[in-house]
Amino acid sequence: MVKYMVLKIKDNIYCMSFIEWKIKEYRGLDIEKGTTYNSYLILDKNNVIIDTTRIKYFDELLSYLKDVANLKLDYIISNHISPDHNECIEKLIELTEAKIVTTKIRKYYLDAQFNTKDWEFVIVKNGDELNIGNRTLKFITDDKCEYMLTYCVEDKILFSNDLFSQHVVYKEKIDSDIGHKIMLDAKEYFANILLPYRKSILKILNILKDLDLEYICPSHGVIWHIMIDEILTKYRMWCSDSYKNTAVIVYATIYSSTEKIAKALGEGLSEEGVDVIYHRLDTSPLNIIMRDILDAKYVLVGSPTINMNVHPKVGMLLTYIEGLKPSNKKIGVAFGSYGWKECATKKIIEAFKRLGFKIVDDKILTFRFAPKENDIKKIKEFGRKLAKINV
């Protein structure tokens, strides 16, 4: 299989996209479509590489730099300190003696990863610029955000690191060749990786609105060109905790009892015009569930009681959601079934309280063994009433 692709973005500006075809997991996420690690090369009086890649691709990276730049490298810009963007830095410095351009806080983390005693650093702050010959690079950063962004003023290109990324491999590298399906990939990435940093990202978005942008070049996935305004608008929405009239119903079930409650709730909600998305935990990966929860108004979680607790997959879900700290502008509903003693919904409600959700509770949503026909009618009615409640 092809290990990397090269795309010429503009004269003397290239994307080296290193392809991880068979990756199944990234930071605990299920990765179904692979991912890429994008490194960017600018050839000028001073040659610059913006972020590197995983060490297993070093030979390919080195070969390309020899071919197009004769291994002349003056600056390595480190927008992010995680290994998928930095593992090749040490070897590149040994071969080129390039200077590292980064922020004070990111230097601290590079010092923790490498022996940097002999490295030459250029420490930059938000708004600082670096002239590399015919081009000026401007740096955008917020120390509460994991990522620094680099803007090429003359070419109107934003190198955004993880912002605007997607975990996906397409044979095409530009959004114009793919279409709007890329938006779902970008939403999934935001919901599962960037969501805890949304307040800092919103500050960065306020800076970006004053920039003239022709390309946004992220560290993973596809480059943005014709859909820049749309992805910026989406990011602003996701960062501002706005929501749609959507209900995400997530559940685990053993003997279909909890599933019957889930379906009845969904029918009641949909009858009142709410868009309903079902996720059964034995078939839906957490990252897709979180993508849908991101801008949903209602989050309904169901579990049978097992060993005086929630189903293990529900426990994993709740822990995962809490770690990502979604908006508290949501209505939370717990439901479930039990045999001896009901415990699951209490655990779910405790998690909702920690998340700050508005909780709507009703005894009609818990059943010993399974709901009967008359119970199903009551559950649907609860769903219809739920659709009229405001956050």
Swiss-Prot record:
Q: Which InterPro entries match?
A: Flavodoxin/NO_synth, Flavoprotein-like_sf, Metallo-B-lactamas, ODP_dom, RibonucZ/Hydroxyglut_hydro, Rubredoxin-O_OxRdtase
Q: Where is the Flavodoxin-like domain?
A: 247-387
Query: What is the recorded name of this protein?
Result: Uncharacterized protein MJ0534
State the PROSITE patterns in the record: FLAVODOXIN_LIKE
Natural source organism:
Methanocaldococcus jannaschii (strain ATCC 43067 / DSM 2661 / JAL-1 / JCM 10045 / NBRC 100440)
Q: Which Pfam families does the annotation name?
A: Flavodoxin_1 (PF00258), ODP (PF19583)
Q: Which PANTHER family match?
A: ANAEROBIC NITRIC OXIDE REDUCTASE FLAVORUBREDOXIN (PTHR43717:SF1)
Q: Which residues cross the membrane?
A: none
Molecular-function GO terms, alphabetical: electron transfer activity; FMN binding; metal ion binding; oxidoreductase activity
Q: Which CDD domains match?
A: flavodiiron_proteins_MBL-fold
